[in-house]
């Protein structure tokens, strides 16, 4: 009995008498398979013989009971050295088989369990009645019985059935007589029951209820069966089945309510073998609450029937029973203080390579009790801000690092060069063929060389070498060398010595010489021969520097380009001769083009400054040790992305050296130079390289396993030897050796997600390596790169011995973590740029404008508001933000553009006064433009100053101006006025680039950066990756599994970008590296702006961010101003004609039937969408305040639908009184009598959708206060439904712009349509648009039908919107002209009387550049032919043909050639 087996017997308390029996004498545990997710342990035992049945049953029962107590399921099977086929033992085990699944099925057990068995002719024979000896039982059940006997220890046993005629007759006779007796008894029982019933039947009114069926007892029995039921792996279900039990994790839940009030819970579960869709019905709310455990992330046991869902056509479980189960996550079982620190972990910011968020990585480390964890994403630090915040919250040290791409600044062409005339030198051009890429683990099989002088081959060397083992198929395929070539080969040492003699007094030459020289030196060293010391020329680097314009510099492409023969590439003799021919071509060109004659000149005069771009990348891990190191890290990341980017961010070694203070370096993974040296050059070379680093990394053997498949390492023993060699390198170099995990995902079962992400990159991607060549290439396996606990890591390194494993896994990693100081990644304060006298300027501009409008002295209400705002703005250092925004708006205004405000900036009266926003947040009021007399309405009776009736100033008679939207300042900077202002501005799209450049001009190029963004894999994209993986790798997933895999693969960084309008301004007394690295968006080194490396949201509370967005409204207003000469500022906000648009179409001179809508909203910003048009139709707004309500209602979430809409329909509230914008809540509650602070807090809770999420005590406090102040219940209930609310200032700015546009639609229609089609229309179909009303209406009808059938394309949907406006324009009596070759503009619509002439870009397929070219060409002269239009105008044949079909070209001939008869007429 083995020690392990004995220990198990102690644990299950197996009786001593059974343990001492002969059957247990050599008992052993062959293998234990542990399935952590399903909590199933599979034991495989070895015994000397098949166990006595009593012993087997005892072993089975004790195993099950012991492990069941720990919530673990157990199965086991036995391998017996000797098998006893006695009838008694076989009969006992035969009956035992029916106690085990799947042989315990009711139909099989009832028919077979009592039958007799015998052993005859090496078969187990079952004597059975004839009616069960059929194909169904043979095919369905006998294979299960064979498997069960194999598990008992009988080996593979042949089982057969024979029909027993005597048994068949006896059973048939018994069945017939029993059936007759049963029928007779049933008839008799029925008659007696009926008589008894008639005799006992009571009067109707005293009817006695039937005996109650004990449902509770039945349910208890059913539940007990559910608890003990066999769990079916999801992957095994392929057809409809009943009473199936699953266990797994819920990853998606959706609850729906039917029209009848029933509820359905659609959810998806996975057990990580596959995934399944499930549904559970609940008849009412009470029953629904019983299934609250069905939630995302919950682990459940469910039972139900598998059926095909008629809607999804997928197998779906209709759940009958459900129970939440305990899921045991992996734990780090080492004692406190003896746990490792993970120092090499990637997050989802490692581009298309890793999965965990930095938060989940840190949470896992903290949960396991680790004192620290490192972040080492590939070449970026975008996880730092979130990691910094999460680590502080979790109470764990975050070690901030990255895995960098290190390159040499200049890659030499020549190694060990000497002063030598290249023309007079003798060269030995050589090549080696090997069994792999590792000089330490693979073998030389051929050395070939050509000795050359002045371009001529003077001697050749060619020797095969027997490696002592058969060649792999891959080696033979690659090199063409077979075992036959090696039969008579000389010993390796003999060949090495001969080659050294051959190479004397010459320059060595090889293509990719570092490989060949490294391989030779490793073999020289192994055989105590001197290593290469003479000069070496690498023709690969020679070609890269001599011909930088070539994309490929491999031997094959170069020989083709220079027409050098290479018949058998990858055989050393052919490769060497071809390389020699190329060498002398290179030498000639170097001499003629660059004047290079001496060997020393190759490195000094020819190696390019940017040769780092072609240098081989080596990975290194870099860690921030202190605050100085953090800034140096930011500088390195910036330089690698801005100055040294080539395919990936690169860090030249000298650049790293210059910024190494405060940083620590590790040797990284198998792509690091120290690991590579151990593999290819030997320990001595690795020791020299290791001196550059602060520690040596080793990783679990499983991480290096793909190197075995790629034939870089022979086997597991080879991996372990490499790890030992790395430890030896650390010992010799006096560097600590640390075990790291190279984490790319957290849990082992998440491996498939990374597999899908990596394979989506396609062959050729750096991390998606392949094995083999050409069509036969297969993807190399990815390593098992989950986050390992200390125990798991110690197990991985157990081959090192307990003490050494503990040292590298625990002690050294903890010591390293202790060297890391706490650093501040994200600043705690706001750092705004400095503008001289910003505070004085803001105050001066404010009062200057206020005095101009309201007079001096100011009205108290104005004076107090300004004082309140300036106290906050100036006191918190926000003046520079205001002033910067004012300068930008002012510059755009000077260029002739209005600037619209977004967000809550219009809540600030100071912002209004200094010109940042047009929105005036004061209460509605009158003010006289002549004498500055003013009147304020402060009781809330008027929603907007624009709605006040017109009246003259009572003092001077001048017509009053009206303004004021009643918006509290608190909604912008918070109740205490200390919230960082977020000033968003809508510039004209045409002027946006100029506004961006204004920021640079104001603050300086080195302080202004575009706000960076990070683009991750969206779930829809991930879905495509999963389907592609299915297709490419022959996988077949059910829909639920596809959904799970897509969700798992989503969220990984894919690219970077920039905010469309956000610009970050760094204070001019600091530099950008105090806050963030910088880079180019999407790695586009030609971009005109650099961006913040961090997502701008990560630092938006530390630096000034200006939102300079492009918008159509200011562009539209500028276009209308240019067309009309009307200053948009002078357009009244209460124009009766404009307001009439919201109640009908009469003002347009058309009927609703003509334009297909009951109001004039088509094409009006904010109000022209189908959704808002519907709201207008329901509410009929008549005031500016009501339009603000509509804007708020349409932009909010759960503010209109199911809320305000119902209140208005039921007559409970009106458009004026419902909650529309967030600010209205505070203003309304203050007018009702609540304290401002409470009114503000309620507004904040409601607008963020937190009303139902706060504590019941807090919410009830607010409700009581509102009811005490007579706030109606419907208002309170409405608050509880809201998820998000729109700021009133934003609504006011948008509505004001919309009304200005609407003004032109009413009063200057042709100009409006011209501006609309030039700026807002997204799709055109000129043939239809120029074809008249009938053509337009017919096309609209066509698209409408397609929409109903969900067949309309996006372009057709956009076209429908355009055609609605065309139809309206035509119905109003205007005309849509045809494209005119000589009158149409390139990009703008033209007005000719009552007709619009479309521009060239309106023609489908004709872009802006061609449009401008046509206009330019026609100015040079008339187009005499279609050929000339194509040639001078740049139009394609397709475009010319389309123009001709539309009648634009008239009778234009095909070409300019004159007819032979033209001269006669």
From Swiss-Prot:
Q: InterPro entries of this UniProt entry?
A: DNA_pol3_alpha_NTPase_dom, DNA_pol3_finger, DNA_PolC-like_N_II, DNA_PolC-type_N_I, DnaE2/DnaE/PolC, DNAPol_HHH, DnaQ, Exonuclease_RNaseT/DNA_pol3
Q: Which GO terms describe its cellular component?
A: cytoplasm
Leading EC class: transferase
Keyword Cell membrane found: no
Give the family from UniProt.
Answer: Belongs to the DNA polymerase type-C family. PolC subfamily.
Which taxonomic lineage is given here?
Answer: Bacteria, Bacillati, Bacillota, Bacilli, Lactobacillales
Give the primary localization class: cytoplasm
Which reaction equation describes what this protein catalyses? DNA(n) + a 2'-deoxyribonucleoside 5'-triphosphate = DNA(n+1) + diphosphate
Report the protein's function.
Answer: Required for replicative DNA synthesis. This DNA polymerase also exhibits 3' to 5' exonuclease activity.
The cross-references to SMART domains, in alphabetical order and at most eight, read: EXOIII (SM00479), POLIIIAc (SM00481)
Q: Which GO terms describe its biological process?
A: DNA-templated DNA replication
Where would you find this protein in the cell? Cytoplasm
State what protein this is by name. Answer: DNA polymerase III PolC-type
Q: Which Gene3D superfamilies has this protein been placed in?
A: 1.10.150.870, 3.30.1900.20, 6.10.140.1510, Metal-dependent hydrolases (3.20.20.140), Nucleic acid-binding proteins (2.40.50.140), PolC, middle finger domain (1.10.150.700), Ribonuclease H-like superfamily/Ribonuclease H (3.30.420.10)
The GO molecular function terms of this record are:
3'-5' exonuclease activity; DNA binding; DNA-directed DNA polymerase activity
Q: Say which species the protein is native to.
A: Streptococcus pyogenes serotype M28 (strain MGAS6180)
PANTHER family the record matches: DNA POLYMERASE III POLC-TYPE (PTHR32294:SF5), DNA POLYMERASE III SUBUNIT ALPHA (PTHR32294)
């Amino acid at each position: 009995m083995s020690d392990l087996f004995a220990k198990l017997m102690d644990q299950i308390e197996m009786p001593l008498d059974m343990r001492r029996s002969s059957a247990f004498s050599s008992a052993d545990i062959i293998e234990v398979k542990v399935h952590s997710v399903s909590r199933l342990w599979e034991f495989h035992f070895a015994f000397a013989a098949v166990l006595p049945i009593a012993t087997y049953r005892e072993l089975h029962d004790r195993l099950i009971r012991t492990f069941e107590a720990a919530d673990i399921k157990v199965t086991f099977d036995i391998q017996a050295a000797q098998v006893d086929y006695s009838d008694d033992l076989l009969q006992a085990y035969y009956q035992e088989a029916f106690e085990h699944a799947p042989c315990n099925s009711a139909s099989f057990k009832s028919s077979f369990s009592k039958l007799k068995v015998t052993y005859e002719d090496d078969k187990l024979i079952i004597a059975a009645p004839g009616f069960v000896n059929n194909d169904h039982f043979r095919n369905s059940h006998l294979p299960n019985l064979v498997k069960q006997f194999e598990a008992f220890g009988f080996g593979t046993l042949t089982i057969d059935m024979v029909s027993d005629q005597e048994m068949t007759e006896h059973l048939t006779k018994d069945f017939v007589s029993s059936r007759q007796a049963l029928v007779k008894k049933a008839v008799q029982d029925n008659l007696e029951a009926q008589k008894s019933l008639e005799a006992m039947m009571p009067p109707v009114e005293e009817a006695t209820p039937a005996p109650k069926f004990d449902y509770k007892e039945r349910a208890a029995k059913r539940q007990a069966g559910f608890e003990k039921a066999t769990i079916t792996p999801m992957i095994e279900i392929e057809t409809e089945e009943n009473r199936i039990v699953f266990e797994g994790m819920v990853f998606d839940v959706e609850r729906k309510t039917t029209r009848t009030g029933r509820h359905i819970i659609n959810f998806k579960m996975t057990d990580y073998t596959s995934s399944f869709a499930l549904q559970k019905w609940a008849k009412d709310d009470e029953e629904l609450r019983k299934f609250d455990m069905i939630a995302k992330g919950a682990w459940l046991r469910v039972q139900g029937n598998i059926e095909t869902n008629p809607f999804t056509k997928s197998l779906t479980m209709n759940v009958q029973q459900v129970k939440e189960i305990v899921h045991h996550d992996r734990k780090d079982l080492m004692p406190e203080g003896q746990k490792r620190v993970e120092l090499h972990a990637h997050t989802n910011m490692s581009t298309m390579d890793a999965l965990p968020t930095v938060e989940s990585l840190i949470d896992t480390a903290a949960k396991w009790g680790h004192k620290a964890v490192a972040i080492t994403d590939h070449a970026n630090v975008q996880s730092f801000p979130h990691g910094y915040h999460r680590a502080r919250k979790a109470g764990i040290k975050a070690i901030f690092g990255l895995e960098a791409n290190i390159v040499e600044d200049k890659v030499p062409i020549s190694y060990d060069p000497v002063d030598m005339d290249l023309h007079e030198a003798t060269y030995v051009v050589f090549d080696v063929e090997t069994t792999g890429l590792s000089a330490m683990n693979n073998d030389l099989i051929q050395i070939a060389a050509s000795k050359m002088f002045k371009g001529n081959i003077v001697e050749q060397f060619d020797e095969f070498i027997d490696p002592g083992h058969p060649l792999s198929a891959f080696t033979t395929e690659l090199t063409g060398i077979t075992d036959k070539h090696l039969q008579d080969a000389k010993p390796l040492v003999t060949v090495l010595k001969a080659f050294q003699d051959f190479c004397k007094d010459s320059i060595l030459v090889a293509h990719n010489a570092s490989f060949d020289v490294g391989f030779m030196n490793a073999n020289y060293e192994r055989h105590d021969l001197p290593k290469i010391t003479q000069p070496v020329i690498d023709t690969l680097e020679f070609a890269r520097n001599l011909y930088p314009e070539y994309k490929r510099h491999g031997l094959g492409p170069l020989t083709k380009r220079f027409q050098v023969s290479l018949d058998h590439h990858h055989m050393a003799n052919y490769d060497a001769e071809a390389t020699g021919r190329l060498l002398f071509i290179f030498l000639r060109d170097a001499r003629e083009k660059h004047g290079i004659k001496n060997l020393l000149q190759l490195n000094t005069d020819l190696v390019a400054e940017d040769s780092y771009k072609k240098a081989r990348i080596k990975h290194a891990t870099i860690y921030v040790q202190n605050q100085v190191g953090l800034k140096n890290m930011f500088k390195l990341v910036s330089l690698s992305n801005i100055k040294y980017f080539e395919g990936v961010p690169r860090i030249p070694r000298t650049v790293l050296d210059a910024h190494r203070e405060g940083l620590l370096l590790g040797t990284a993974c198998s792509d690091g130079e120290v690991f590579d040296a151990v593999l290819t050059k030997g320990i001595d070379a690795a020791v020299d390289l290791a001196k550059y680093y602060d520690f040596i990394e080793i990783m679990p053997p499983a991480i290096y396993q793909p190197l075995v498949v790629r034939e870089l390492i022979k086997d597991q023993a080879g991996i372990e030897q490499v790890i030992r060699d790395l430890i030896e390198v650390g010992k010799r170099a006096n560097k600590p050796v640390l075990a790291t995990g190279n984490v790319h995902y957290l849990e082992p079962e998440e491996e498939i997600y990374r597999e899908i992400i990596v394979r989506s990159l396609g062959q050729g991607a750096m991390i998606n390596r392949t094995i083999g060549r050409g069509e036969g290439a297969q993807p190399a396996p990815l390593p098992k790169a989950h986050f390992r606990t200390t125990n798991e890591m110690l197990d991985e390194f157990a081959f090192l011995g307990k003490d050494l494993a503990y040292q590298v896994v625990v002690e050294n990693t903890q010591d390293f973590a202790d060297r890391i100081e706490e650093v501040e990644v994200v600043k705690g304060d706001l750092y705004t740029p400095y503008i001289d006298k910003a505070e004085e300027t803001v105050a001066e501009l404010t009062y200057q404008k206020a005095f101009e409008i309201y007079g001096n002295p100011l009205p108290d209400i104005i004076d107090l508001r300004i004082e309140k705002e300036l106290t906050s703005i100036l006191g918190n250092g926000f003046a520079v933000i205001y002033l910067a925004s004012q300068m930008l708006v002012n510059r755009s205004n000077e260029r002739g553009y209005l600037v619209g405000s977004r967000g809550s900036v219009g809540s600030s009266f100071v912002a209004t006064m200094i010109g940042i926003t047009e929105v005036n947040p004061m209460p509605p009021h009158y003010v006289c433009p002549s004498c500055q007399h003013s009147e304020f309405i402060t009781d809330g009776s008027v929603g907007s100053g624009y709605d006040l009736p017109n009246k003259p100033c009572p003092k001077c008679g001048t017509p009053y101006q009206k303004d004021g939207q009643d918006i509290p300042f608190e909604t912008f900077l918070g109740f205490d006025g200390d919230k960082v202002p977020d000033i968003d501005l809508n510039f004209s799209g045409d002027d946006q680039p100029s506004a961006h450049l204004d920021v640079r001009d104001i603050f300086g190029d080195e302080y202004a950066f575009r706000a960076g963004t990070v683009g991750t894999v969206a779930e829809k994209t991930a879905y495509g990756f999963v389907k592609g993986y299915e297709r490419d790798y022959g996988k077949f997933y059910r829909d639920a599994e596809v959904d799970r895999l897509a969700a798992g693969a989503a969220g990984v960084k894919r690219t970077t970008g920039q905010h469309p309008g956000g610009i970050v301004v760094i204070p001019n007394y600091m530099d950008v590296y105090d806050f963030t690295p910088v880079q180019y968006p999407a790695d586009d080194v030609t971009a005109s702006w650099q961006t913040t490396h961090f997502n701008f949201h990560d630092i938006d509370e530390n630096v000034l961010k200006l939102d300079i967005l492009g918008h159509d409204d200011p562009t539209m207003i500028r276009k209308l101003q240019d067309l009309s000469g009307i200053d948009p500022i002078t357009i009244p906000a209460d124009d009766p004609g404009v307001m009439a648009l919201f109640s009908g179409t009469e003002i347009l001179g058309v009927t609703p039937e003509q334009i297909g809508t009951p109001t004039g909203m088509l094409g009006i910003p904010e109000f022209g969408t189908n959704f808002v048009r519907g709201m207008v139709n329901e509410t009929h707004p008549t005031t500016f305040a009501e339009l603000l309500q509509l804007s708020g209602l349409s932009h909010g979430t759960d503010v209109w639908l199911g809320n305000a809409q119902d209140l208005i329909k039921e007559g409970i509230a009106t458009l004026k009184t419902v909650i529309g914008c967030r600010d209205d809540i505070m203003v309304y509650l203050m007018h009702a009598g609540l304290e401002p602070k409470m009114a503000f807090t309620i507004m904040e809770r409601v607008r963020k959708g937190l009303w139902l999420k706060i504590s019941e005590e807090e919410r009830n406090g607010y409700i009581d206060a509102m009811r005490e102040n007579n706030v109606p219940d419907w208002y309170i209930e409405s608050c509880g439904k809201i998820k998000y609310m729109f700021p009133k200032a934003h609504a006011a700015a948008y509505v004001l712009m919309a009304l200005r546009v609407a003004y032109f639609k009413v009063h200057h229609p042709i100009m409006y349509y011209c501006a609309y089609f030039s700026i807002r229309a997204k799709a055109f179909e000129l043939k239809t648009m120029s074809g008249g009303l009938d053509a337009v209406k017919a096309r609209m009808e066509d698209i409408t039908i397609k929409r109903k059938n969900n067949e309309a394309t996006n372009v057709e949907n956009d076209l429908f919107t355009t055609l609605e406006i065309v139809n309206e324009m035509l119905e109003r009596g205007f005309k849509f002209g045809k494209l005119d070759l000589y009158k149409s503009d390139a990009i703008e619509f033209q007005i000719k009387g009552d007709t619009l002439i479309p521009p060239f870009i309106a023609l489908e397929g004709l872009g802006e550049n061609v449009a401008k070219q046509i206009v330019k060409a026609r100015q040079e002269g008339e187009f005499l032919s279609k050929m000339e239009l194509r040639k001078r105008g740049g139009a394609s044949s397709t475009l010319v043909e389309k123009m001709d079909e539309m009648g634009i070209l008239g009778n234009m001939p095909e070409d300019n050639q004159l007819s032979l008869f033209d001269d006669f007429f």
